[in-house]
Amino acid sequence: ELEKWLKIEKERFSDLVLRLFHTELESVYEEFNRAQDNDGRLVHYALMEELFPKHPNGQQTTLGKSEHLKNPSMKAIHQYFNDFYVPNNMAMVLVGDLDFEETILLVDEYFGKFEYKELPKKEKIIEEPQTEIVERIVKSPSAPRLNIAWRTDSYGTKEEHLAEMVAQILSNSGEAGLLDLNINQKHKALRSYAYELGFKQYGLFSLMIIPKENQSLEEAEQLLLAEIEKVKNGDFPDWLIPAIINDMKLQKIRNLETADGLATALYGTFINNQ
């Protein structure tokens, strides 16, 4: 079965065939339209635009804009395929009960003749330091919500790990984080949580809160900022950080014990140049 799969994938990556182009475009357009009244996506898009005013992280969504979908260039798609679908820009991650010597020979048989190509040079985009608070209002039919976010460092850096730790101190399985204990469980708001995202370049740390009925966004914001102050002042139990670290280790071990988890860890490392 592995050889059949390799044969099919070799054909797929050898030549781009846009036979189903218009059918796929309709599917993408449908997803794009669904996103237009999804307040979670709309808020996220606005947040990313303000955090990254220069970088594609904030200036280019996965689906793009409506004008991109209205006039897609098949020539540009072919050019992108030819530029980036090259062996020195690819990784094949195979996990499972494999005979690795035989597997390597099969991979080499079907993919070994792919030619190395120089990748198009990309200039590193540097964002200016944030010196002031930027506010954006996003209109949607859903309940009010507030997101606060800070730009952080890239995936795998010390700062990204620290941002992940702070997110865990604030939101910990819905039970032991400061937001869990002091806001959610005390019913001071409908819901609140913290999270961090590390990208290949830069990252973000964010807080989200959904206020109760007749509670203003300004009041909800103060609830979040009060918990941030507690983190800054070390006002949380001594056992929390060691517990978070132990849980992170446990989750990592569990992930690596599954084929999907191991494969995801490997290709994630490749994508982020780690």
Predicted regions and their residues:
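M16 family metallopeptidases and their MPP-like homologs
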Residues: E1-E11, G40-E67, N89-V95, P144-S154, ...
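Active-site-adjacent, His/Asp/Glu-enriched structural segments that form or flank metal-binding
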Residues: E1-R41, P56-N57, H68-N89, L106-E109, ...
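Surface-exposed patches in mature extracellular/periplasmic domains of secreted proteins
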Residues: L16-E24, L119-P120, G234-L240
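PPIase-associated folding chaperone regions across multiple families
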Residues: F21, K158-M165, N184
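An aromatic/glycine/proline-enriched structural segment found at the starts
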Residues: K54, T62, A91-S154, N255-L256
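Short beta-strand/turn micro-motifs at beta-sheet edges
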Residues: H78-N82, I133-I137, R191-L197
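Short, solvent-exposed loop/turn segments at the edges of secondary structure
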Residues: Y85-N88, P129-E132, S140-R145, E160-H161, ...
